[in-house]
């Protein structure tokens, strides 16, 4: 037993590395300490062992989560340090920390850094990191939905079939293309670069982009002016390259893409293209030194240039043969001229561009412009003729004559000589016009014309029933006169229904609102229908017309429903009925207009008038509700006439059949104009336009306010009595009333 106790005591002493007064040296990672009056070697903090023979480092990092969340532990001799993982930082801003110093790891918001994701991208912070997403209209270069800057991804523009509708997309593509070809300063190389790009498969946005570059880029046209190469062949090559480039933009296989554009946008870009083609051709040709002729012929574009000096001017007759026809320029004769002058005459022929410039969207209330008939089509090539002379008065145009073959037979149709009329400062309003041109001969296959100015020419075909210029002018005067008279009559009606207390009733309330709606519609029409120079203002006017005309229709419908309720003798609550009448009369048109605008706001306002475009059948957002209301009114009309006929026959059995029919006819006529069934002529004019439907529709609707005044006020016995009371105290008026 004593031996066992001795062994235990020795073991304890050894474990404490007992030596008298630590006579045995302690290890470097140990220190001598007195415990219970006994000196011994003990390992320092962070180490374990007997202090004499061994002191091993303690790996604190083996302990789970010793550093807390979002941190990693790093063991050191006699201790450890904590570091925040990527995407986190210490709360105290230190690089490293220990758990007992009050620090912890918190998320770093990388999105606070400007442009951390690069161009056209947005940053989204996440716990311990962030993700990048491309903005609308862009996608990652690697096809990923999200990315980080260090994975090699970046945002690039999405070029798709709908991109042409977005201005930002076009602008971005133009800038990108200019950056790529901008460093090229040599003219032929630049034209060749654009031509080479146009030879590849093109999207609509590519075509529009290159047209904008040709139109707006000063690098091309400016360098043309500064080029001094003496080689005419050099510039001939430039003209060839340029002609092929334009051809690639207008050849037939691009028409399907062009058709994707709204009519006004398509016309705008084609106008820019034709203007740029004419301008650049003249600019290049100015550098040709010799008297020469240049021809270029491609699939859908032909080009011919005459360059001559004043010495050869009398013997040069600029002309161009055009696919079975020709075009010829005749200058004014002069007795004296500058012997050092020079002249350039350029012709371009676009063989297939005509259908893209045909008219399609100019219908409103039966009125059509003399410059753009409702169903006109281009049935020939489009030719361009331009002159540049130095000095400018050296070679002035007297006339241009041309004969063009028809691409379609013109049987039972009339042809017209026309030119593409546009302003260089505003190319949005390009349209066909016949001003300054006259037809000299026409048959089923060819038409000959003579014009007094230069631009782009073509032959138009329109149905023989189309409205002629004289008819259009007459219709315009009828519309203006009728609306002015109607406004006066409607103003009298509004005054009558508003201020004559003796006639106040539900029916006069309906009449008052109907007259107000129609008054505002016709006032906006008279003032703003032709304010088409500002697209935004024109769209607002079209929207107001859409709303007020629909409101007038709604109150017309209410009139029919109310008369039906009276005739059939249904019992109704007056207050409830009035409330619902106002809701239907003013809210339902607003719903229709709002819904239509949300689906196709760009169809409010055309290049001709501030009305709804017929493109994509958008005009039916007005005609549809109008037809529905007309149908409801016609049904109510039938019931009312039937009831009135029976009622009249029952009350006056002694009245002859003629008088009975006349009584019914008077009421029928009143309802016919009052309830707007004359708008049926408008629908007929849309479906089958003719001079007859145009006159019927224009007269019946322009004077609708006058008809309302006649039937609601003049022929009303009660209102006659009110007018008598009003004017009987006025001597001059009383004598007239006697």
From Swiss-Prot:
Protein topology in the membrane: Multi-pass membrane protein
Annotated site residues (Cleavage) in this chain: 454-455
Bridged cysteine pairs (disulfide): 22-32, 26-41, 43-55, 61-73, 67-82, 84-105, 111-123, 117-132, 134-155, 417-449, 437-451
Name this polypeptide is given: Adhesion G protein-coupled receptor L4
Species lineage: Eukaryota, Metazoa, Chordata, Craniata, Vertebrata
GO molecular function: calcium ion binding; G protein-coupled receptor activity
Gene (UniProt): Adgrl4
Keywords from the named record: Calcium, Cell membrane, Disulfide bond, EGF-like domain, G-protein coupled receptor, Glycoprotein, Membrane, Receptor, Repeat, Signal, Transducer, Transmembrane, Transmembrane helix
Family the UniProt entry places it in: Belongs to the G-protein coupled receptor 2 family. Adhesion G-protein coupled receptor (ADGR) subfamily.
Origin species: Rattus norvegicus (Rat)
Listed PANTHER family: ADHESION G PROTEIN-COUPLED RECEPTOR L4, ADHESION G-PROTEIN COUPLED RECEPTOR
CDD domains: 7tmB2_ETL, EGF_CA
